[in-house]
Amino acid sequence: MYEGKKTKNMFLTRALEKILADKEVKKAHHSQLRKACEVALEEIKVETEKQSPPHGEAKAGSGTLPPVKSKTNFIEADKYFLPFELACQSKCPRIVSTSLDCLQKLIAYGHLTGSAPDSTTPGKKLIDRIIETICGCFQGPQTDEGVQLQIIKALLTAVTSQHIEIHEGTVLQAVRTCYNIYLASKNLINQTTAKATLTQMLNVIFARMENQALQEAKQMERERHRQQHHLLQSPVSHHEPESPHLRYLPPQTVDHIAQEQEGDLDPQTHDVDKSLQDDIEPENGSDISSAENEQTEADQATAAETLSKDDVLCDGECEEKPQDIVQSIVEEMVDIIVGDMGEGTAVSASADGNAGAVEDGSDSENVQANGIPGTPISAAYTPSLPDDRLSVSSNDTQESGNSSGPSPGAKFSHILQKDAFLVFRSLCKLSMKPLSDGPPDPKSHELRSKILSLQLLLSILQNAGPVFRTNEMFINAIKQYLCVALSKNGVSSVPEVFELSLSIFLTLLSNFKTHLKMQIEVFFKEIFLYILETSTSSFDHKWMVIQTLTRICADAQSVVDIYVNYDCDLNAANIFERLVNDLSKIAQGRGSQELGMSNVQELSLRKKGLECLVSILKCMVEWSKDQYVNPNSQTTLGQEKPSEQEISEIKHPETINRYGSLNSLESTSSSGIGSYSTQMSGTDNPEQFEVLKQQKEIIEQGIDLFNKKPKRGIQYLQEQGMLGTTPEDIAQFLHQEERLDSTQAGEFLGDNDKFNKEVMYAYVDQHDFSGKDFVSALRLFLEGFRLPGEAQKIDRLMEKFAARYLECNQGQTLFASADTAYVLAYSIIMLTTDLHSPQVKNKMTKEQYIKMNRGINDSKDLPEEYLSAIYNEIAGKKISMKETKELTIPTKSTKQNVASEKQRRLLYNLEMEQMAKTAKALMEAVSHVQAPFTSATHLEHVRPMFKLAWTPFLAAFSVGLQDCDDTDVASLCLEGIRCAIRIACIFSIQLERDAYVQALARFTLLTVSSGITEMKQKNIDTIKTLITVAHTDGNYLGNSWHEILKCISQLELAQLIGTGVKPRYISGTVRGREGSLTGTKDQAPDEFVGLGLVGGNVDWKQIASIQESIGETSSQSVVVAVDRIFTGSTRLDGNAIVDFVRWLCAVSMDELLSTTHPRMFSLQKIVEISYYNMGRIRLQWSRIWEVIGDHFNKVGCNPNEDVAIFAVDSLRQLSMKFLEKGELANFRFQKDFLRPFEHIMKRNRSPTIRDMVVRCIAQMVNSQAANIRSGWKNIFSVFHLAASDQDESIVELAFQTSGHIVTLVFEKHFPATIDSFQDAVKCLSEFACNAAFPDTSMEAIRLIRHCAKYVSDRPQAFKEYTSDDMNVAPEDRVWVRGWFPILFELSCVINRCKLDVRTRGLTVMFEIMKTYGHTYEKHWWQDLFRIVFRIFDNMKLPEQQTEKAEWMTTTCNHALYAICDVFTQYLEVLSDVLLDDIFAQLYWCVQQDNEQLARSGTNCLENVVILNGEKFTLEIWDKTCNCTLDIFKTTIPHALLTWRPTSGEAAPPSPSAMSEKQLDAISQKSVDIHDSAQPRSSDNRQQAPLVSVSPASEEVSKGRPTAKFPEQKLFAALLIKCVVQLELIQTIDNIVFFPATSKKEDAENLAAAQRDAVDFDVRVDTQDQGMYRFLTSQQLFKLLDCLLESHRFAKAFNSNNEQRTALWKAGFKGKSKPNLLKQETSSLACGLRILFRMYTDESRVSAWEEVQQRLLNVCSEALSYFLTLTSESHREAWTNLLLLFLTKVLKISDNRFKAHASFYYPLLCEIMQFDLIPELRAVLRRFFLRIGIVFQISQPPEQELGINKQ
């Protein structure tokens, strides 16, 4: 302690002694100083002695360090200040220097703290006076240079020392003094030192503020931990929590653009600018409230101690931060500054708890301390809860009118913040000082001050910590001061100022953009883009702007933020869009001619423009990189690991991955402390922004339309739902939308249309004029639109205005009525025109104006002074619209008129001035506006950004590649295109992607249709870029693969030319051309023609140079890269590979279709990639193969056989490889794979290719049979196609292989082939149907029979087989997959083949049924017979009559009998299932116009019933009877009775040719219609005679050529019906009584009659073989009715002589008149038999009565009819019938006989008169005898009876 004092005393003593020793002090005017020094020395001496140390006390500490504070020496050094103060005030430089030096050391070592109150000025501390004294030493430029240096040193020490505290005005004074020294000093070293010192001071001031907040945050954090620990009683992690403040030191991203240019500064300076002092003066003397002094020194000491203890805790963290910030200049200061920063500041922390709000509007910073002493800091300032501190005052947004001072809502949470604020604000104001007029002088104070202030501001911003970046006070300061300053300096013509402004802007954009949304917009709109867009702006300005833009464009966050916050904001300008458009123009070199730039300048500007565009795209790529999948970092196959070389490629790929936004600006969104931004910004929802963007585009479109035609614009906006329909809505729109053309708005409002008037009224009513004077109101009204020219329009507007004005100001007494206001308004308009229009020469005087307005106030005058005031105001300022915010960019016309550089400069400066004004006005206007800023986080934004800007990008890159050979430009363009493709790919924006890829493809020069002249390096690079794109973005290229693969295809051709190799054309096409080539000398080689390189004659030199330039394309790297695209196809994802393959096939197709030279390059590649990709998952592979297979389909059918052969052979190899892999059950990949073989077989008619396909398939079967599964389908399909071929070798090979499969492969691999079992059978049936090879046909049917054996032997295999038809029950699968196909195909054979094969097929089909039918289910039979009955299907029968007839007589016949056999064999199963169908089928047969078939039908009916009747149920019998009934009814030939010859009917043989006699003879003859149809022999029923054409029709066709065909057809049909009727009668007879029974009976009856032995004993037939016994009486009656109906019809016909004659004449049935005798007799005979049989049947007693009744009626009717017969032959026919009748009657009992005999008696008597045959007579005799006996007329002689009985 003692040592410390000693040092201090030594300092003081030496300094005082030095001052006293100076000769100047001896002078009188320094007496006061001298005295003060002496007194001080004396006191020091006394004190030293008093405090000499006791012996033995150890020497504590180093003497130079400040003593440990205690009460005793707290203010010791301070009391010796007076001599120094006086010394400083002396004008002697030496004394001043000594004094300053001592003060500096005392402050530095902490001996002088100045904490005591200043005795001279109440409310101030001593330290303030000390600083003031130091600053006072600077007396302007004339101050001694040494003194200047000492002042700088002392002030730096004061500001940076941690032992003393200076705040507010004192800090400002210190800063200002250094600033002035920099400006005023002529000494370069002093200037440099002053500047460095300033930088360091600012660093310290701001760092202290940040540190204080940091400490406080830590303190809070500890508190929180402690409390948590207390609450939880659980261990809490001891890591420092990541408080938002820990990340406040930004990396210095923006380089110091303003490097200290000390060398340039001229030491000579003029007088210090007074205004500068004035500016800072008022900030002086701000007084710190006495509150802080009331706290006792003891409190401060303890506070300091506690804090310093705490500081130990954070030593580690705090240590480096100040070091980072403070750039030491004065070496000795470093040690002190590095010391604990916290200590000095901490003391005041408690004292200035919340040191007051800055009063609004006060320029001098008077701080009212409104804090209560000792208030804990946390109440005002809680860093860990930022929301508390950041609450945005509600006044903020409304405060735009009030431009000075921070908003009242914001408060400083600490005095250190206020210090920083004051310094910052002063610098802003300094930078705004205007420069003197004329060209800027680099040495002038104004300019140097401006530059320095901007440099310092830049430094502050670059090092800004979290508090500065988030505290509302600073944000407001930036808005209100810095941004306004920038708007002024941002258009400076001094490059250095301009450059600094840009750097500051960059920093703001980087760190503060979340708070400065509006300001950034103004800066971009009014400065950056304006300078880029104006043709007059200088190259330097453009260059600097574009340099800055390079930085902005390189930061992804900034780029996306600009789009989201401006282009998607309805009220903001489209900055991103404009930026891209402007850059694109610059990159295209547009507008540079007018500027008179040199070529070098133009090129460098173009490059920069391109660089910016590429940067923007890189940012977009970077921003969306998470969505990009690099195909080379993954493999879709996963079969082999990538090789070493590939790994290295992946690690350093030439891909876009290396493009980051390398020099990206540091963005607030990433800093934790940006809570302000997150709080203010809306959520980042891309969809929402897209909607906004769309709305904005609609609004912009609407405004454009409005500015051309208002009504159209409004209508458009209403249609789009962006504008309401009411007048109020539209009026509001006119008020709010500033982009509307004011003239058009005026025209719209003035229009006389009813709606327009309503809008105008609403528009005026939305103005509030209350409390405004009349002229102000009028100005306000006319601000928004330009008054229209027509008087009536103005009139309407003024009228409404006057009314509204009075409505708003009802209390006014000036105007008597609205009329007055209206007239006055009108007069004001006239006055403003008069006074301010250049056209009006004689201006109106005030008197004239007053006179003009006489008597307008309800015949009274308005006060003269009132009118006079109006006149004066208008004269001073005309009424005009407010200046529109948008600066109009000079039109084209002015651009061209710039004659010289000088004139351009002049114009530019004028524009700059205007621009600065606008920018400043706008900045001030928005300085209080709070606009939410969204920090973009979502990668989706890139999509709409790119969609918006892709065209200007493309234009720039295309033009660049097109017209510039500079390699940098080319590489930038290519890089840009790559990025653009990447973005379009990632977001699958197809149109844009395709456009860029096409552009690339175009610049490869490979696809041009005109000839290639020569390839430049840029074209080669383009090819490489294209290949790289294919490599890195393959997954996303979609349709763009087309362009790429087209180029690769052409590249191969180019390589061939480059290397001079003859292209490997397909031999087939080149063969013919070889000859022509050799002969002609001046013709180009083919390959050149192929590429379209040359026309007719050739310049060989040119070709040589082309070859050379193209040679580069076959460099190793290109070849490898191309190859890598194909080998790398395995890494493409599932969708991409499909696109790739699809387009590869398309290109291959183009190659092959080339008329001159088909090439197979791509086809070979297809084969290669098929090999590479075969290992993909089956799902992907099948999609790939769908495309490739289709391509092979087409190629395999190529008319060029060589191509087709290559295709088929490639297919074979691929298939072999594919089949080797085998296939699991239920998969179908082989089927898809082998399908092209089928297609080629189907479509290619070339025998060579067809043969080759069959051979390939045969080879596969032979070598891979074990692996084939679903592929069998295709194999059979191919053989199926081969089966119908006419080429024997093809059919033979195919059939051999099929046979091999069916006999051997099926045996071994049956389960694998089940799926294609049907196909196999189908294939065999196709062979069977090939009529050209009958042997094969028969063999094929044998193989089908063989297949049936497989089904029968292995039903289990079918049951277990599962496939697509999972809905088939397992037990039915045998049927569906096995039996059904076999039987179905056989039915097909039957339907399609010639007779012998058909018959064989039919036989086999029924053989299979008979052999295996026992295993069939009921419903199978149903399906089966559906097939079988197809044989009879009318639709399927042959068309031609003869064939049809043949078919019916052979196949149908055969089938019919076969069906009946099967039915009989499986009756139990089939009776339910099949009977109806069989009956239906039989019914069908009898309806056909085929006699044979009709006979067979009835025949089969008979067979079925006779064979199975015993097992029939009652129901079945009913059905049988009904069927018979139906047949009967259908086949009654009614038309025989109704037919009439048509009038023009050709007559029968003409009467002239025949005599009457002959005619009569013929007419007497009659022919039975049934005669031609031979009766069926009962013993051999089945072999019915085959009559194909009924003789009737034969007769007609031969004999009567004139007869009409329809008649023949009809007659033939009628004939068949007659036949069927007869057959049916026979059938019923056979069924009921068994075949041949009746015939036998007739024969017996005849024989008995001949012997005259008819027995009339009652005898019942019991030996019934027929079905009689199974039929019920009702059923029998039904049959009976049929028979009788048939009988009656025949009777009717036979009796109708006239009709028969007509038919005979028409040629029906030959030589004589037709009749139906057989039908007439046999039907009745059968009926009688049935009735008599029933009559004698004991079991049918119940029916006897009816039977008797029927018998009596039938018999009497028959006898009556017989009596009417005239023709002998007719009666003859009845012989058997009468015999039967009489015999039967004779055999009934007497009793019954009575009834019958009495009934018939008279009729029988009548019969006697006919000439009857002996047998009949014999029976009649018996009858009459019996009558005698029964009626007891006579007694029979015994002997006679006896004889009979024997």
UniProtKB/Swiss-Prot annotation:
Residues 661-681 have a biased composition (Low complexity). Residues 267-277, 641-655 have a biased composition (Basic and acidic residues). Residues 688-877 form the SEC7 domain. A motif (Nuclear localization signal (NLS)) lies at residues 708-712. Pfam families: BIG2_C, DCB, Sec7, Sec7-like_HDS, Sec7-like_HUS. It is found in: Cytoplasm; Cytoplasm, Perinuclear region; Golgi apparatus; Golgi apparatus, trans-Golgi network. The modification Phosphoserine is found at residues 52, 286, 289-290, 394, 407, 1076, 1563, 1566. GO terms for cellular component: cytosol; Golgi membrane; nuclear matrix; nucleolus; nucleoplasm; perinuclear region of cytoplasm; small nuclear ribonucleoprotein complex; trans-Golgi network. One of its GO terms (molecular function) is protein kinase A regulatory subunit binding. It comes from the Eukaryota. The keyword Protein transport applies. This is Brefeldin A-inhibited guanine nucleotide-exchange protein 1. It comes from Rattus norvegicus. The gene is Arfgef1.
